[in-house]
Amino acid sequence: MKSQYFTEEHELFRQSVRQFVQKEILPYGNQWETEEKISRDLFLKLGEQGFLGINHEEAYGGTKSDIFYTCAYLEELAKSSYAGVCAAVSVHQYMATNHIAEAGTHELKERFLRPSIEGKKVGAIAITEPFGGSDVQSMRTTAVRDGDHYIINGSKTFITNGHFCDFVVVACKTDANAGINGISLIVIERGTPGFSSTQLKKIGWHSSDTGELAFDNVKVPVENIVGKEGMGFFYIMESFQIERLVAGILGIGGGEQCLEETLKYMNEREAFGRQIKKFQVLRHEMVQLYTELEAGKQMTYNACWLVQNGEIPVKESSMVKLYMTELSNKIVDKCLQMFGGYGYMEDFPIARAYRDARVGTIVGGTTQIMREILSKIIIDDVRYKKVYSNPEEIKSSAVSENKTAVEKTWGNPQTAKEIILSIPLRIKKEKASDYSTVFQFDISGDNGGQYTLIVNNGNAKVEEGLQGTPECVVTTDAKVYEDIELGRMDPTMAFMGGQIRVTNIGAMMQFAKFFHRI
């Protein structure tokens, strides 16, 4: 069938990946599942075939092929039904090395990118910490400058390839007081004194090793920093878009394989004297799954097309991640049901698919985080800019965006008290003409206090103390409240991390529509 995205060359490439999977993955997959790691030879063979370089520049051994080669490649890897293999390879190729490829120096690229493309080195990326998952900016791992080196202390967890890798790109705070502007990416090599790892046990992705990393006074040369100091958070945010598309592409291949295996079983399995594919309820269930997968496929390909044409499709990639990972769970659940008791047996690949799919709605940004990102874009009209090509512009805008307009309108509030007292000046009067509410703010710490905000048909006032019957009570520390209001902390992350408590989240979301942000 003709495609607006794939050419004959793409299809020939797809066939070569399919043959590779049949020869180099399928015969060894069960062994890797048992050993809980894949063979290093697989990376070497992927490198020899040129697969690990399809997304990287030619100067370092890649081919810089268009993104639809990546689609064909990852879909075929996913059809192996070994999601752990897919995780290990995709993290190495599209996440760990991606930052080095986009922002690293020539020296870093020669030391880490080139051998990664050749399959001679395996990479990992370490962002998640024991005390914070999706909340990137709350990380505690630090990198303190000491002459020509950084001294790194902290820990990371749930790191794919973490116990297996030759190097890891670590997100850490180079300036503990700068918020999101103080996070940097630094490469640490396996074997560096003070760097240790422990392999974690998981319910799925068995062939992909997952590690917990510890850094105890790890000394790393300053040359190992990726890009500019203090730009790590922004690099991570942009690279998340590719990570989310990778999840969607793998979901296409895995979903198609799961449905194909289920149809094959339905052809063979008989009940009540006929093939179970003849039962209308089962036929309709399968057709519905195929329809939903086709919708997800087109959504994913459209987002990939946007990337290919120079866009950073935050909205579309977040939709892909949200939709495809939820759909993957639905597909494996429905398909396992078709297999009946056999689907619950480890001898059938559907059992492994069921275990493996579950983590999809957690890694790379949870379903809940995807929905909040989309809420900001669709409801709050938030816009995102490219980072790698405009690092200084992005960093400065994170600090001072709209500062002039703010000062002209309602001053320049900095403390929690000043911010709360400025709320009546920030009301969108026309939009809030029919809006009435009572909010209480219980703010602890210096510059905190207790306040009641009363809004009556677009007119707002703040009174000291907790008065009346509130629709919502906001409880937090003054520093946290200031960081949220001044753009130094993501409110969703603060809420999920328990740093701010809101008694009525629906009322708070409604409230936010009627007031200008600082």
Say what each PLM segment does.
Residues 1-81, 90-91, 103-108, 115-120, ...:
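Alpha-helical interface subdomain recognition
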Residues 116, 131-134, 158-161, 175-177, ...:
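Short Gly/Pro-enriched turn/cap motifs at secondary-structure boundaries
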Residues 119-127, 436-443:
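A short, Trp-centered hydrophobic/proline-enriched beta-strand micro-motif
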Residues 138, 191-221, 466:
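Flexible, small-/acidic-enriched active-site or ligand-binding loops
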Residues 141-144, 453:
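A structural signal for short hydrophobic beta-strand segments in well-ordered beta-sheet cores
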Residues 148-149, 153-198:
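A short core secondary-structure module
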Residues 214-238:
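A short, charged helix-loop
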Residues 395-518:
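Feature captures hydrophobic
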